[in-house]
Amino acid sequence: MDKTQSRLRRARQTRIKIAELQVARLAVHRTNTHIYAQVFSPCGTKVLASASTLEAEVRAQLADKSGKGGNVAAATLIGKRIAEKAKAAGIESVAFDRSGFRYHGRVKALADAAREAGLKF
């Protein structure tokens, strides 16, 4: 089993447990250059809010700072944006789905920023 298969196996187990809880899910995906966050409905079929480093507003803000979307500063910005969008959609608490990635670095920065912005998990 390689690294990718191991990560996907961990992600699948997490999603099964979150589905049993029937709560909104904050899913995070990271690549070398970007980070993405989506809030899914409790049934898991609808995306209620999303934010990523590909958005034009985010890219403009990052151009002032570092110019890249694959760093902790970008993840912090995405965490704040996803929390604001989720709260605007009426979502106060979510289950955090790290998609099998380690809770470290950019994933942790996104989660901490979302918590500071008022999202509960």
UniProtKB/Swiss-Prot annotation:
GO cellular component entries: cytosolic large ribosomal subunit
UniProt family annotation: Belongs to the universal ribosomal protein uL18 family.
Record has Ribosomal protein as a keyword: yes
Xref: HAMAP family: Ribosomal_uL18_B
Lineage top rank: taxon: Bacteria
Species: Paraburkholderia phymatum (strain DSM 17167 / CIP 108236 / LMG 21445 / STM815)
Any one Pfam family match given in the protein's UniProt record, by short name: Ribosomal_L18p
GO molecular function terms listed in the Swiss-Prot or TrEMBL record: 5S rRNA binding; structural constituent of ribosome
Keyword line: Ribonucleoprotein, Ribosomal protein, RNA-binding, rRNA-binding
Protein name: Large ribosomal subunit protein uL18
Subunit structure: Part of the 50S ribosomal subunit; part of the 5S rRNA/L5/L18/L25 subcomplex. Contacts the 5S and 23S rRNAs.
GO BP field: translation
Residue ranges that the Swiss-Prot or TrEMBL entry lists as coiled coil: none
S-S bridge residues: none
Job of this protein: This is one of the proteins that bind and probably mediate the attachment of the 5S RNA into the large ribosomal subunit, where it forms part of the central protuberance.
